Amino acid sequence: MKILLFGEFSGLHNNLKDGLIKLGHEVVIASGKDGFKDIGNDINLDPIFSGFIGKIESRLKPFYKLPKLIGFDVVQIINPFYPNSKFFPKEFFYFLLRTLNKKFFILGAGSDAFFWKYGKKTMRYSPFKEWLKYDIKKDSYYMQSKKSFNYNNRILKTSNGVIPVMYEYESCYQSSSKCLNTIPLPVNLESIEYRKNIIRNKIVIFHGLNRYGFKGTK
């Protein structure tokens, strides 16, 4: 199959691509480089310019690259709110991706309106309060709005399904008939050199540097 993976969060689609290629599929990633992580892709959606010109470019580039994003058997988007650019016509763009390709799936990953609405109800522990307090320093977030939820729901209903990457997202989408089986986060073990743990007098825990409120590090 010819597969398009649209968007990227922390190498998720890159690891998935490795596995799909090994299974014999043709895979293309169209995304930005996820900020400081500088993650690779096949079609780069990051702007070349900075400032105001860069903001305009970031909103036009997905449409400019559209001829390279059509004719796929399967399209999977990393999140219905990707790219997270104000005034980018996401709903129209995803309509084009659905229309010009065969199947269209959403990944249940990152933050979306379903996660914000149902996460507080279904999970005993959640990062929402800390995200508001420490990361954006506001009392509310736009994904809590009815407008965001209705948009999220429209994208869901017109898709072939949502694929959660862990139980938290499954619990938030489980009321929808579009919720498919959870497929855990992919990891390419062949790219990781195994080194035996050396146990000394203390335990060292690695916790990646990212978003203090949401993930607990800064």
Predicted segment positions?
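Glycine-rich, highly charged phosphate/nucleotide-binding loops
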Residues: 48-66
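A conserved mid-protein helix/loop that constitutes part of the nucleotide-sugar donor-binding site
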Residues: 11-15, 212-218
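Active-site proximal beta-strand in glycosyltransferases
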Residues: 74-76, 95-135, 180-182
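A short, active-site helix/loop in glycosyltransferases that binds the activated sugar's phosphate group
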Residues: 115-116, 140-182, 189
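Short N-terminal targeting/anchoring amphipathic segment
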Residues: 2-7, 65-89, 103-107
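N-terminal subdomain of nucleotide-sugar transferases
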Residues: 1-38, 42, 99
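Membrane-proximal helix-turn-helix segments that form the acceptor-binding/catalytic region
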Residues: 64, 92-99, 124, 128-161
